[in-house]
């Protein structure tokens, strides 16, 4: 099967650091009690409790029987999958990397999460389409004028979660990307772009590269995959390059670009500045080089990776599975979804053709 081509090592540490209470259902499993494993970007509060109260009521109505939906907070996608396979949970949202690396037994990919599209990234296109740098150039016009350190909550439409001026509110997409940020003097920027356009990996690397942990999709994996396509045989792979020339690499977040003068290229989530509030009066504004003469811009974006996927236990009947997916969609459409928007889910869609809607997209990004 396709997913056997993806090799992942799941550290045993996951099983020891996750509290036992997160691995065991919070109620005795029965036909009328379902357990959802969820992630939160904030502490569980009354809004989350209310969400599951509403969800339980709607599910009970669809199935014409009393159903209670309880939840556990579990952040790791592999643990969520294991819980469903072990019959300790019935539903969970997991990242697409975990789906790609799993044997896909005991559960069904049910719904695809969606998020509001960025203005200049509305289509699911790839490196070979030749549009990734064009997207970056168009986004730079929004990102850099005015520069981030001058962004204002009112002018740039800060909502409390994001800067709305960067988004296309009427468009939902199922994917995200990594971005490659570059900084330096005018001559350095020109030289970095020259090395990129000439596909000269050795020259490109000399400018210093900031990356994330090896298990980070946006800050390690997606840039690595992009470089494999772009630099081709001249590229040894990101980890091999780090091992060979460690002085040319460092762990750096995108918002910290320009602090380390030896690092001119940094990987980050695409448009991470869109949800990072500019703190007026800060002595060290994010996305702002220390040297006032240095510039900053997005060089390019990576290929896409799918947003989180809702998976459901195969121990549930198809009627149960379908009802769960429909309720998520209905709550989002009626603006009653108190959970999804808190972690970036602005909508959902049923997965009708797993091979086409999930497998083919993953294959195209990872390479067949």
UniProtKB/Swiss-Prot annotation:
One cellular-component annotation, GO: plasma membrane
Bilayer topology: Lipid-anchor
UniProt key word Lipoprotein: yes
Subcellular location: Cell membrane
Residues carrying lipid (N-palmitoyl cysteine): 26
Signal sequence region: 1-25
Keyword field: Cell membrane, Lipoprotein, Membrane, Palmitate, Signal, Transport
Main location: membrane
Lipid-linked residues (S-diacylglycerol cysteine): 26
Record's function text: P37 is part of a high-affinity transport system.
InterPro entries according to UniProt: CypI (IPR010592), CypI_dom_I (IPR043099), CypI_dom_II (IPR043100)
Protein known as: High affinity transport system protein p37
């Amino acid at each position: 099967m396709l997913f056997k081509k993806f090799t992942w090592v799941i550290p045993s540490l996951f099983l020891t650091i996750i509290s036992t209470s997160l691995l065991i259902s919070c109620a005795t499993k029965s036909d009328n009690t379902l357990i959802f494993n969820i992630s939160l970007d904030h502490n569980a509060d009354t809004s989350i409790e209310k969400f599951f109260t509403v969800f339980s009521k709607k599910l009970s109505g669809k199935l014409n029987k009393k159903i209670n939906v309880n939840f556990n907070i579990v952040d790791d996608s592999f643990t969520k999958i294991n819980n469903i396979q072990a019959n300790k949970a019935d539903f969970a949202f997991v990242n697409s990397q975990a789906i790609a690396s799993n044997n896909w037994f005991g559960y069904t990919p049910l719904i695809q999460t969606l998020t509001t599209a960025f203005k200049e990234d509305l289509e699911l296109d790839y490196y070979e389409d030749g549009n990734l740098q064009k997207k970056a150039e168009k986004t730079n016009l929004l990102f850099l004028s005015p520069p981030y350190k001058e962004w204002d909550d009112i002018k740039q439409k800060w909502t409390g979660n994001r800067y709305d001026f960067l988004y296309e509110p009427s468009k939902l997409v199922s994917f995200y990307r990594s971005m490659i940020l570059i900084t330096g003097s005018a001559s350095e920027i020109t030289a970095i772009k020259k090395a990129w356009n000439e596909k000269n990996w050795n020259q490109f690397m000399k400018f210093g590269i900031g990356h994330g942990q090896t298990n980070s999709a946006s800050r390690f994996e997606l840039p690595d995959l992009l470089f494999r396509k772009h630099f081709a045989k001249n590229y040894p792979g990101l980890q091999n390059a780090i091992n060979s020339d460690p002085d040319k690499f460092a762990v750096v977040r995108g918002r910290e670009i320009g602090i380390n003068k030896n690092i001119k290229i940094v990987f980050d989530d695409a448009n991470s500045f869109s949800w990072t509030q500019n703190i007026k009066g800060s002595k060290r504004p994010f996305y702002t080089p220390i040297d006032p003469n240095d510039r900053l811009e997005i060089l390019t974006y990576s290929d896409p990776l799918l947003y989180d996927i809702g998976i459901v236990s195969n121990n549930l009947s198809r009627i149960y599975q379908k009802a769960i997916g429909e309720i998520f969609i209905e709550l989002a459409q009626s603006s009653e979804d108190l959970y999804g928007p808190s972690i970036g889910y602005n909508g959902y869609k049923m997965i009708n053709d797993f091979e086409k809607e999930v497998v083919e997209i993953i294959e195209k990004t990872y390479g067949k």
